[in-house]
């Protein structure tokens, strides 16, 4: 509905982003696109693009530690996901300038970023209607820990030991 606003963690509709322009040129240009071209760069499409980029960068990060060009095990890829360090320079080089904020993850911090922004539907397209907001981690972290502790207790899960982090 026109005027509807949504909070976006990291990305939103980004049809002008370099990564989107590259997809349009290199995939859709030669006729290799499989979905509707007008969806490229929209919110759900960007969710997939960001997710795939994070997965690829996790494998790349794992290969930096465990051997470039080698097939990575699931444990090695997990290490890569837990040791991402995508600064603004790297995001820009990947074509993600303006799409998302820098992300740095660890074994203890799988979220990596606490930024969000609001975008609003104008009847034809999504437009950002705020700057980036950062969550107050003094409020969020205790809530996340309490929920995680409850879940682990309910499911009788054992937490990973700090030495298992391998960072």
Each PLM stretch: what is its role?
Residues 33-45, 52, 56-130:
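Segments of small-molecule ligand-sensing domains
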Residues 106-108, 162-167:
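Sequence contexts marking disulfide-bonded cysteines in secreted/extracellular proteins
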Residues 28-29, 67-68, 85, 95, ...:
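Short, flexible coil/linker elements and helix-boundary hinge sites characteristic
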Residues 1-50, 132-133, 147:
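Extracellular/periplasmic periplasmic-binding protein-like sensory domains
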Residues 86-90, 160, 167:
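Short, charged N-terminal helix-start/capping segments
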């Amino acid at each position: 509905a026109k005027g509807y606003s949504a909070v976006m963690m990291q990305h939103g509709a980004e049809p002008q982003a370099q990564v989107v322009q590259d997809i349009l040129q290199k995939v859709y240009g030669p006729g290799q696109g499989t979905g509707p071209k007008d969806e490229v760069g929209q919110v759900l499409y960007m969710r997939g693009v960001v997710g795939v980029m994070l997965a690829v960068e996790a494998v790349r990060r794992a290969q930096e530690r465990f051997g470039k060009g080698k097939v990575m095990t699931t444990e090695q890829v997990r290490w890569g996901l837990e040791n991402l360090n995508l600064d603004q320079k790297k995001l820009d080089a990947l074509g993600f300038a303006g799409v998302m904020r820098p992300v740095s993850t660890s074994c203890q911090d799988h979220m990596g970023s606490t930024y969000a922004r609001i975008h609003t539907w104008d009847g034809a397209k999504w437009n950002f209607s705020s700057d980036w907001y950062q969550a107050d981690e003094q409020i969020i972290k205790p809530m996340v820990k309490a929920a995680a502790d409850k879940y682990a207790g309910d499911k009788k899960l054992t937490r990973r030991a700090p030495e298992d982090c391998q960072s």
